[in-house]
Amino acid sequence: LLVPLPTARSSRRRRGDDPVGDLARAGARGCPPGIHLAPALRHTRRVADQARLDRGARAANLAGAIEVSRRWRQVVRGSTCVLVDDVVTTGATMAEATRALRAVGAGHVVAAAVAATPRRVTPALVAHRVAD
C-alpha cells in the first residue's frame, strides 16, 4: 500500500492542494498491479506548525496526532505500507505515522520521500564523532 502522510486541512485550504497526496497518486500510477494507493491516515487533532520546532518539540507536537481511519484498518492489517512524504526533516511525522500503522497491525512499514533536509551539526555531535 502507498500511504501518503496526511495534510492538515488548514494547510490544504491555504495552499489549495495536497502535494503529498498528489505525489502518492502519481507514484501509484507507475506501480505494478497489486500496489494500491491507501489514503489511510488522518489527523486526530490540530498540531502546531512544525517549521520552527526542534526535533524533540516536533515529536511531542505529533504524539498521538495521527491515526488510521476506521474504513482502512482492515486493509492495513497485515499489509506492507510505504509511507509517502515530500520532505523529511527530523522524521517525527514518519515516526508518528509508523506508530499509527503498527497500532492497527500493519505488516511492514517503510518510508519514501522526495527529499530530506541535512542534519544540523552541533558542537556536541562533532565532539561525539571525534571521540569515536
Which positions does each model-derived feature cover?
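Active-site glycine-centered loops adjacent to acidic/histidine catalytic or metal-binding residues
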Residues: 86
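Conserved PRPP/pyrophosphate-binding segment of the phosphoribosyltransferase/PRPP-pathway fold
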Residues: 1-83, 92-132
